[in-house]
């Protein structure tokens, strides 16, 4: 058993050692993955009346939303343990709010659902990769981003509730709901086009397949006119394939 475990360990070590490149090697690494994105200090206050007619103030904190990321890294092996890379990526970021409901003095219920902001960036990460174990590296650098679009949407509705707890929506002549609709917003003119952030994380390479996990925290405000310091914060998970040149 000990010989078997030792043989397996040696085999794994040899396999991961293959991920270490010769000094001077250039590599192309296409990657795709998913973002879990949020925006700091992007909170809202919703006021209404609670069922006992008391003032109801609800603070809604932004939540993480999923988004696509994909692009290409060009990597150079500078020394045995250190490589540098530059990349270009399309990155979908933003945030979302959980559903909410408030009640006014006339006992009309107002709900919001599917509230989210979608920020599409072209990002340029410049990274240093330091090998900590064969096949495993710690990565850190700086990332510049250019905002391509900034859009939001919210599904809104209002209704009354009878004594039996049944909801009633107002309808038009054709049976359509009068106060249940989706609003869309374009926030590009209120947003800063350029963004600077710091990405840090780890990557694991096995047989030219590389798994990368990063946390990206923004250094610059994304909004132009509000005093709150709203900044990007993103968890990024990608898978790529290394083509050595």
Q: Could you say what each language-model-derived stretch is?
A:
Residues 1-31, 239-245:
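Bacterial Sec-dependent N-terminal signal peptides
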Residues 30-34, 68-76, 88-90, 124-132, ...:
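Residues on the lipid-exposed face of transmembrane beta-strands in outer-membrane beta-barrel proteins
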Residues 20-81:
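N-terminal hydrophobic targeting segments
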Residues 71-106:
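Mid-chain, structured segments of secreted extracytoplasmic proteins
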Residues 21-23, 77-81, 133, 207-209, ...:
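Outer-membrane beta-barrel channels and translocator barrels
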Residues 2-6, 10, 68, 72-82, ...:
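N-terminal capping/interface segment
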Residues 38-65, 93-120, 147-195, 199, ...:
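Extracellular/periplasm-exposed beta-strand and loop segments of Gram-negative cell-envelope proteins
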């Amino acid at each position: 058993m000990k010989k078997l475990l030792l043989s397996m360990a040696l085999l794994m070590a040899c396999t991961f050692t293959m991920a270490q490149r010769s000094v001077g090697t250039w590599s192309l690494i296409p990657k795709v993955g998913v973002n879990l994105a949020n925006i700091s200090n992007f909170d809202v206050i919703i006021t209404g009346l609670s069922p006992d007619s008391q003032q109801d103030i609800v603070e809604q904190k932004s939540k993480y939303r999923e988004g696509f990321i994909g692009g290409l890294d060009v990597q150079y092996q500078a020394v045995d343990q250190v490589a540098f890379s530059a990349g270009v990526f399309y990155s979908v970021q933003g945030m979302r709010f959980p559903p909410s409901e408030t009640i006014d003095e006339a006992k009309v219920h107002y709900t919001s659902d599917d509230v989210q902001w979608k920020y599409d960036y072209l990002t340029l990460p410049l990274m240093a990769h330091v090998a900590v174990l064969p096949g495993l590296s710690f990565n850190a650098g700086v990332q510049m981003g250019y905002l391509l679009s900034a859009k939001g949407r919210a599904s809104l509705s209002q209704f009354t509730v009878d004594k039996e707890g049944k909801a009633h929506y107002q309808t038009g002549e054709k049976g359509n709901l009068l106060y249940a609709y989706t609003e869309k917003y374009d926030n590009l003119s209120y947003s800063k086009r350029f963004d600077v952030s710091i990405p840090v994380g780890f990557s694991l390479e096995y047989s030219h397949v590389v798994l990368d996990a990063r946390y990206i925290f923004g250094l610059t405000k994304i909004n132009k006119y509000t005093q709150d310091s709203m900044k990007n914060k993103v968890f990024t998970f990608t898978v790529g394939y290394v083509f050595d040149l």
